[in-house]
Amino acid sequence: MLQVREPSEHDIVTLMAELGRRGRAAARPLAVASTERKNAALLAMAEALEANTGRILAANKTDMEKGEAAGLSAAILDRLKLDEKRVRAIAEGIRAIADLDDPVGTVIAEWDRPNGLHIERVRTPLGVIGVIYESRPNVTADAGALCLKAGNAVILRGGSDSAASSAAIHSCLVEGLRKAGLPEDAIQRVPVTDREAVGEMLRGLGGNLDVIVPRGGRSLVERVQNEARVPVFAHLEGICHLYVDRSAKLDMAVALALNAKMRRTGVCGAAETLLVDRAVAGTHLVPILEALAAAGCEIRGGEDVRARFPSAISASEEDWRTEYLDAIISVKLVDGVFEAIEHIGTYSSHHTEAIVAEDPVAVQRFLNEIDSAILLHNASTQFADGGEFGMGAEIGIATGKMHARGPVGVEQLTSFKYRVHGSGQTRP
């Protein structure tokens, strides 16, 4: 019987180094590829995805069966699952990226110096991007398409949970590159699930990776942030808050709380903590919690919350620091917008926060004083998404302050350089 040998550590080092070299080689022609050629590749990818829907769903069925047998949580299985509607949405997302303006070559600013020099700041690709993700096969397409549009090569390392689905999707992306005459190595997929492959990416593949973007749970993101020797665009977790001010309209507060928590509980933009102004606890708190409970949400709160809503479970200090990714919400009464800001400043992961209010002073204070990547007024936290921002799609959400913050779309996947035009000037 043929024995299948797991790759050795030496094999993985060699494999990953080769992926890095090929990615760098592909990045050079990609950086100067025309918008028309990149868009042709994207449209061909979308067509290939739709034409191969049956093959993609068969691969996804294999992943789902393995995931169920392994006891994966409902939230992870939801992220992993594909159906015809989701595959169609992935294809439409790629078409939307093709419709976006090409950021490469855009003159961000220009000015003239007294000595006659004309200076331009121009957008350029980052180079080679590494994307490390878990049970999200759609990231294969989103990341590949976004990086291509921004003129970057990308190396994709999906989790073992989504290996078959990601491989099927990746083959469609390569088909699109081939049809458009672009290097097939512009979008590479790590073909092994050994974790040492991640380690090699974090070490930078011999200087051939320029940025790493992790998409996954806390343990993955922590490892990337702690070990990476190249810049990282990431958020550790999404502890998102919804604050209901004393000036909030009740019907709006109920609708936004319900959507922010329950539309999809497993996404990073789902609200995990509800803060309610104590001044409207008598009118707003119970209707909001009744709506959440009726939708199947578990309520956790302090004694003042439980006194008004006895079915609530007692909240601990740990609840304020927890990203549930489930139908659970922690609830706290606060003394106005100042205490809401203080609570968020203490417990937030700096991802997304929202205020429901009609008072412009409270709104401005909330938006100005909270240091999170995304702040919303009278809108659900679940709008924390690059597609909803008009970016076509996103490669992730970044909560850091260097280079990229918030949804990471095509513009955030570029850097810039200076072009200086002279007429023979020499420096005195």
Swiss-Prot record:
A molecular function (GO) held by this record is:
glutamate-5-semialdehyde dehydrogenase activity
Cell location: Cytoplasm
Catalysed reactions, semicolon-separated: L-glutamate 5-semialdehyde + phosphate + NADP(+) = L-glutamyl 5-phosphate + NADPH + H(+)
* Keyword NADP tagged: yes
User: What's a GO biological-process term for it?
Assistant: L-proline biosynthetic process
Pathway terms, separated by semicolons: Amino-acid biosynthesis; L-proline biosynthesis; L-glutamate 5-semialdehyde from L-glutamate: step 2/2
Q: What is its EC number?
A: 1.2.1.41
GO cellular component labels: cytoplasm
The alphabetized UniProt keywords are:
Amino-acid biosynthesis, Cytoplasm, NADP, Oxidoreductase, Proline biosynthesis
Pfam families found in the cross-reference section:
Aldedh
Report the transmembrane regions from the record.
none
Instruction: Give the top-level enzyme category.
Output: oxidoreductase
- Taxonomic superkingdom: Bacteria
Q: Which InterPro entries does this UniProt record tie to the protein?
A: Ald_DH/histidinol_DH, Ald_DH_C, Ald_DH_N, Aldehyde_DH_dom, G-glutamylP_reductase_CS, Glu-5-SA_DH, GPR_dom
Family per record: Belongs to the gamma-glutamyl phosphate reductase family.
| Function field | Catalyzes the NADPH-dependent reduction of L-glutamate 5-phosphate into L-glutamate 5-semialdehyde and phosphate. The product spontaneously undergoes cyclization to form 1-pyrroline-5-carboxylate.
NCBIfam families assigned: PRK00197.1, proA
Tell me the protein's name.
Gamma-glutamyl phosphate reductase
